[in-house]
Amino acid sequence: MAKLTVEDLPLEGKKVLMRVDFNVPIKDGVVGDDNRIVAALPTIKYVIDHGGRAILFSHLGRIKKEEDKPGLSLRPVAERLSNLLNKPVTFVPVTEGKQLEDAIDNMKNGDVLLVQNTRYEDVKDGEYVKRESGNDPELGKYWASLGDVFVNDAFGTAHRKHASNVGIATNMPGKAAAGYLMEKEIKFLGDAVDNPERPFVAILGGAKVSDKIGVIDNLLDKADKIIIGGGMAYTFYAAKGIKVGNSLVEKDKIDVAKQILDKAGDKLVLPIDNVVADKFNNDADTKVVEGDIDNGWMALDIGPKSVEEFKNVLKDAKTVVWNGPMGVFEMPNFAKGTLEIGKFLGTLTDATTIVGGGDSTAAVKELGVADKLTHISTGGGASLTYLEGNELPGIAAISDK
């Protein structure tokens, strides 16, 4: 079902409530990586260029007690946003009440206002009440009453049912739309999963099989090949009876891995060789081994033959979805597999290439190939939920066309 988009809404003179994802790192009152703020700019600019009054909502971090609040104020974000837009941004240091309502009433067409961190609502009078993250119906209704229309551009929180995304949207039937970022995520991830150009290859990495079981299960029916790297590969090794030494293995998931292997046939591509280390440390002694891994050694990256094998599988692909690193990416000596795969994806100019997850995204940025890829997903958990084939509450609540 097609969803309303920001371009379908009347904006001139309207109070446009917008859920954005400004959950960015802040240190000493200064925003570190502002990628998520930059990603929201096209939708914000569209709204204000068309005479709308942009009222922005975002969460930042987790708030479980009063003492968490001062360090998680969105004030530094308002300052960075103001610089990026090259215009004033009104910051309102509260999430409800007269101060907020007056500030909204005083807005003119084209103005931008940022409401305090929505998760301030999770703690009231010292009590952890989760009004925002528990989708308190009264809070969603109240926030919805502050505007005329609603735009959700926060794909990163679409898998969560919060008052600031689902709550507002359900109280504005027929007036809740997707922003450009949300629209892009729905298009690329949706097409990749439901209507991919083939061959469709998924690359799944990261430490734990348990995090990706749902994704593997869903994609086995849809992908032509699934490449497995990272720590999760060694639970599959164990399921095949290959010795894994001291490598990471989820013993309680070996049976699940066996079932996946039986179902997958030759669809699943595992590493042929691995870079093993004598301890979990960047300065460990290392060697490359094929097959069994001896006791006292642990696999921390895929080996050169695996890299070549994975490239071989990828070279003819027309759709590629990559989520998760091939090794311990944060240690430079075990980042090579991840970087090699990232570099190779940048050469697949005829394919739709979609990257999600923190380490995979960091790798393509470090390599400078981000602009050669079709789409970099802004939502870690949200993109995994989407790849599992599950409905995302934040998207479901957006009005249908």
Swiss-Prot record:
Its main location: cytoplasm. Substrate binds at residues 21-23, 36, 59-62, 119, 160. Keywords: ATP-binding, Cytoplasm, Glycolysis, Kinase, Nucleotide-binding, Transferase. InterPro entries: Phosphoglycerate_kinase, Phosphoglycerate_kinase_CS, Phosphoglycerate_kinase_N, Phosphoglycerate_kinase_sf. This is Phosphoglycerate kinase. It catalyses: (2R)-3-phosphoglycerate + ATP = (2R)-3-phospho-glyceroyl phosphate + ADP. It comes from Limosilactobacillus reuteri subsp. reuteri (strain JCM 1112). It holds the Pfam family PGK. CDD domains: Phosphoglycerate_kinase. Gene3D superfamilies: Phosphoglycerate kinase, N-terminal domain. The gene is pgk. PANTHER family: PHOSPHOGLYCERATE KINASE (PTHR11406), PHOSPHOGLYCERATE KINASE 1, CHLOROPLASTIC-RELATED (PTHR11406:SF23). Belongs to the phosphoglycerate kinase family. Pathway: Carbohydrate degradation; glycolysis; pyruvate from D-glyceraldehyde 3-phosphate: step 2/5.
